[in-house]
Amino acid sequence: MRLYIRAKTDSLHAPEIVVFEKTEHLCQQKKMKDMENTSIINGRRIASDRIAELGENEIFVFGSNIHGAHGGGAARYAHQKFGAEWGVGEGLTGHTYALPTMEGDASLKQAVEHFIACAKAHPELTFLVTAVGCGIAGYTPDEVAPLFREAAPLENVYLPRVFWEVL
C-alpha cells in the first residue's frame, strides 16, 4: 500500500516523494523484521528460538494448559507480548495459537491435529511454532516433534529447529 500526502508543493519541496520514500523504507524494515523470525534451510521452514516481535500475519504458537492460565514460560510471554487471552487454553487469540500441553499425550495429539486443521484453513497466516511441550510440560522434542509431521509440508507453518532434527 502506498501512502501519499496531498499538499501544495513548490520547487523546494516534494512531499509525495518524501512520504513515498519513507513508506518504502518502513515496509523494507518490516520485511526484514519478519525475516528475523524465520529461515528456510534445505527446504525446512524454521521458526526462530527468539521471537521478540511479530509481523502482521504471524502467529506465535505456544504451549499452554487447558485452563489458559498463562502464568509461565512461553505462555506468559504470549499473554504479555502477543495478546494471548487469559482463560483460553487452545486456539487462536490475539497473534497467538495456544496448544494445551499439560493434560497428557492423547490431549496434546488431538490439540496438534486441531492446530494443523487451523493452519490449513488459514493460509494467509504464518504460524511460528515454539518447542511446545518441551519446557514446563516436560516432554522432549523426540516425543512432540512427530505430532507435527503433517504440519511439516505446510508452507505457512515454521517449526523449531529441535523439531526438524527429529523429523
Predicted regions mapped to residue ranges:
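Catalytic zinc-binding patch centered on the HExxH motif and its immediate surroundings
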Residues: 2
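Macrodomain-like recognition of ADP-ribose-binding/processing modules
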Residues: 31-167
